[in-house]
Regions:
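Positively charged n-region of N-terminal signal peptides that target proteins for export
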Residues: 1-4
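Bacterial N-terminal signal peptides
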Residues: 7-18
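Short, low-complexity N-terminal intrinsically disordered segments enriched in polar/charged residues
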Residues: 19-62, 143, 155
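Hydrophobic pocket/interface hotspot
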Residues: 44, 56, 64, 79, ...
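A short gly/proline-enriched turn/hairpin at secondary-structure junctions
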Residues: 48, 63-74, 85-89
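A mature extracytoplasmic/lumenal domain signature
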Residues: 60, 70, 105, 114-116, ...
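Surface-exposed, charged secondary-structure patches
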Residues: 82-125
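Short beta-strand edge/turn micro-motifs at domain boundaries
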Residues: 128-153
Length: 155
């Protein structure tokens, strides 16, 4: 529990730091870092769809935290176990809006709206979601430290 709280605090601090930066602190649009993050998003999407455990282990930082649409919080080991067991499978991930990437030195925050079909933690999932991903660039390159899905109400 202490580990979870410290990871959550770090993720909140990262997002708060990123949001609090002035626009001049951001890199220019289509910067090398932004392009790298966009490439990582596509690698992540492909790895999730293909249940590519080796790639996901590299993409997710050791202290990675996922908050699903039901509000459940899962660590890297729990997500990997769910994918290995088949409890988490995605049949499709479709971007409904352009992905927004904001880069702040060695961190990036991405937001998008996606349509998902499959299951998370053994529960069916289908519909539109708002997605936020927090990336950090370290010695291993860009890694995902946290992401969250929020279900959107049908219009």
């Amino acid at each position: 529990m202490k580990r979870f709280i410290s990871h959550l605090a770090i993720n909140i601090a990262l997002v708060s730091f990123a949001i609090g930066q002035s626009p001049t602190a951001q890199r220019p649009a289509n910067s090398t870092s932004e392009q790298e993050v966009r490439q990582m998003i596509e690698e992540y999407r492909t790895a999730i769809l293909q249940r590519d455990i080796a790639t996901l282990e590299k993409i997710w930082a050791d202290d990675y935290v996922f908050v699903n649409a039901a509000g459940d919080v899962l660590a890297k080991t729990e997500r990997l176990a769910n994918i290995k067991s088949g409890a988490t499978t995605l049949d499709s991930i479709n971007e409904e809006e352009n992905v927004t990437v904001r880069v702040y030195q060695n961190s990036a925050v991405t937001t998008s709206r996606v349509t998902l079909k499959g299951q998370y933690s053994g529960q069916p999932i289908s519909g539109e979601y708002r997605s936020i991903l927090v990336w950090v660039k370290g010695s291993e390159g860009w890694q995902l430290v946290s992401n969250q899905l929020t279900a959107l109400k049908p219009k």
